[in-house]
């Protein structure tokens, strides 16, 4: 190479060939040109050119002069920087610059030039890139390690590179920057805090969002230098976290964000930092804990995080924060739980336990977010959440807060739609969440209108999406309905019913609006608006909005027309969509984004629009059912057995025929139904009949060919079909045909003539058919019906036992195990009731006779003839039938008037029957009549006796029914304010007098001052009063108190002269008064209204008499705890300790219940076995669980399961102390005097409970009994099986001799629950007995006295020593106990023919048409004979001979002759 003259060692600068001197004397352009040549020269040189290195040394020093480093032109500076970079490369490892200051200036200069990398579009960018590449490759900056100010140089370099990096740079730029910076970290001795900050600052979220490339650069750098930089990162966090030296860095406040980012980049960077977080989690500073929890939530939930498995102590410590005292911390834990569930399924088990607790958190937001987290994970993949987690969401659908309930319901709905309605989800997933559809529909039982509306919306959008095509929509509905459980089906049916009712209300409103304006019309419109408002959320605002909407309807004819079309029965789904859209568009205001008025109207339109059902939909649904019938449907693929699909489809059509009857009016639909009617399947035919009944009113006119084909089928079903088919056939004929009388005659005549007790199956159908004809056409067959009832139904069916029943200890068996003869008798009873309900009058006194017959069945425990042929389950069925029949007749005013108080009281006692199913079904009948406002108010008082039910679920369900009935009446009175004349029969508070009267005559209430019996009275009263007093509306507490005070001024109208009965009544009043005083603070206020007591139950108050006496024993007053009634939970309490709920105090009585149950040999669920009380803690627990839905049929499931297994197990294992035992004369049977004796005899005729008896004893007996109970308490833990029952029981006392009754204290007549009649010795003859002679009365009194002292008996362990002296007056009287009483042996075991005295059932005949019982019945002669024998024994005292006085024989003969008239 030719060189310019220069000498390196004499300080002269040698330039490359062709390059002249570079100085400030040349222009910028020339300088740039010459520098480019210099750059080219240095670029081509390598480290091995020692000669050239020496030659250009001075040039290298010259280029580092301040002239170049501070040159104003950027091109000059860039070229100089490139030269310097090459010089460092060429002279490496030693630089030609020895001055530290110069080196610092040079590197600071090069760093400044690197800023040119920012503009990737610059023409000089390649030269900047060359500069970066050169210094990165050579690691030129490593020279600075020797400098004192190296930290400043490195920090500036890092900041420069992080600031210039952008998305215009390619991977090479990124790589060189990482190489350059990593060499400084990896090869340096230390990393200063400033340098570390320059890297970490790019990880802070704010910076990260501003420059993503800088974040990526920092991330790459940290990954590259992880091992080298980790100690400095650890030191930084130690200083900040542990020592609190936040001043060491500006990033101290972002420490938790940095930990998260560093963990995501490389977890090894924090190996020593993470243990410090465990310490921070336990900090006393709430905010600090919150920050750590936020951090760890993200770290544990990150997708690829292994932190939980790598650091288990930290994970466990973090889980502990789910229970932190600070609400935001718990909230944060719950919020991020979904990430852990979604990204780490293995952590679900740990999280489940903590989410369970948080799902009951007192804080609403936390419970809400638990649901959100679980639902979010479930929507991603159902496998991520276990059944337990889904159950937490399920529980929260009953939360007390609407926001939480809504989130839970919507979450379940979304999960259901995703996995049940989408085929790709798979059958397994659909199976796992199959319960959701049932649960969501169950919520429709809630009282809250918001819940109900949301269920409707969920059903329309998620369960059966309304936007599907008609065929798909109906298929979805068809198979949904087929797989719903019973209660969900009821809820869905109720939903359609409510929507249909609201549709009719809106239609009525439109009709009222169209009428000319009048004052009455305005009131009617207002009333209708109020009714509709109750079907909308927020009734307060809803009322105002609906008034406004009513005004719009009056003014805008177009909107009114659209609404009329919408509520029209012929409106199709597509028309409904158009109408809703047009109305909302017209009412909407674009300038008002949130319009509460429009939202409310949308709610209304959603509820009334037929979004699912129209004529096309019904046709499509019937085609689906037909496909299933033909076997061409894909039922099995849908997971539904074909038979189940067909029945469900027809059931669905049946329900829709109620709510959308017009949609069925097509020939195709009716022809399909006719085909179903001819099928062999009974259920299918039944459903088809019901659909015809509901929709067929136009068939005769519009579809004559259907009418012609239908008539013979209906006649055939009425004569030969199943009982239900026969019933619906008659109703179809009544609904469809105008010439129904002719059709009825063609059916009635042959059936009437061919009634055959020998063919019970056909006889049942005939009785059903005739019964319904009698009800629908009572005047058409008056004479033959009356004759048939008298001669056939009563005489041949009810009073005749053909075959002996199966011997069993069970009290109930399934329907298919009930004997045909019993089923016939039940239908006979129903037929008589239907006949009476059809007549609706008692002119022929048939009602009186029937009521006497029904009460006789109850008296005789269901075995009317008392031949002993009937099995116990059959007797239970007949008791239920008789009780239900009386309740049915009581709903008709003309028959309610003739039901005597004794008959009413006897009917009431069926609610305490020993058979669980009898109690359950009778309660349902009672509730049905009460909720429809058909039964008089006194029948609501029967609910008070449910407090004695031993089954907790039965008590809870009875309470629900009572709550609903009280609310129904209050709601009715609010809506019909003008019905003041009905106030006495509707105001719920008026149930109190009836309850007091009923409890006064309760056969369990024997001794006026008995503490245990009064406790039971208290429980029964509180059962009713608790609900009545839950709200003090219109000063009702004072009104109830005043009512009770009024009763104490009256006498018992049933037995006005019976001092003991009146004293009982006043004692019950005192119990009620104590309850009122202890549970209310406003009882002492003056009631604005004066109560009116029912004259049938109470005499007129004696204004001259002030009854201020206190009748309660002092010991009982301690049982009335002061304070207000405990408020009941409506929805699930949050974080409530459930373990203590439902526990009863372990009192003496509760222990006695347990022992009593253990030692008795019968059904543990019957009142005769145990009698628990429903205390307040039980109530809370019940309401927390499933009893929040007032009208819900869900309650009682547990007891249903026990019906045939648990409840009956003890019956099979242990002999139950039955009503009839071998000591009773087998010939002893039902006699005719039962049906003819006067039914209302003051004092002597008191209400009884069929199968249960009670009697009183002397004071000495009571004391002895108390002493015996104390001894038994001491022994009860030693031998439960052998210890006697200690719980009071409804039953008769042990048999003792006549002389055991003290002369000073005459025996007390007590109400008894049995078939035996007791006439007190001191009772004077009544007017109805004037025709009897005095001696005859005395004889009858002697008989009754004897009966009281004797009666049937059977030895039991607890009575083993009862055969002592007949004169032992200290013999204890066992306390009452529900169920059949234990039998005790008579005092003298002589040959005793024990008669069966009975309670009087009816009044004296008022007409010649009286009940007739065949003289051929063995019950008559045998029973009379037994009574005569018993009477003779009693008269002659201990003599074993039998004598019959002439007067006695004459009296019996007279009684026989009086019963020989016609029955009806």
Curated annotation (Swiss-Prot):
One Pfam family cited in the UniProt record for this chain: PDS5
Biased composition (Low complexity): 1156-1168
Composition-biased stretches (Polar residues): 1137-1155, 1359-1373
Region feature Disordered, mapped onto this chain: 1126-1464
InterPro entries, per database record: ARM-like, ARM-type_fold, AT_hook_DNA-bd_motif, Pds5
Xref: Gene3D superfamilies: Leucine-rich Repeat Variant (1.25.10.10)
Biased composition (Basic residues): 1286-1295, 1347-1357, 1390-1400, 1441-1453
Protein name, as recorded: Sister chromatid cohesion protein PDS5 homolog B-B
Species per Swiss-Prot/TrEMBL record: Xenopus laevis (African clawed frog)
Gene: pds5b-b
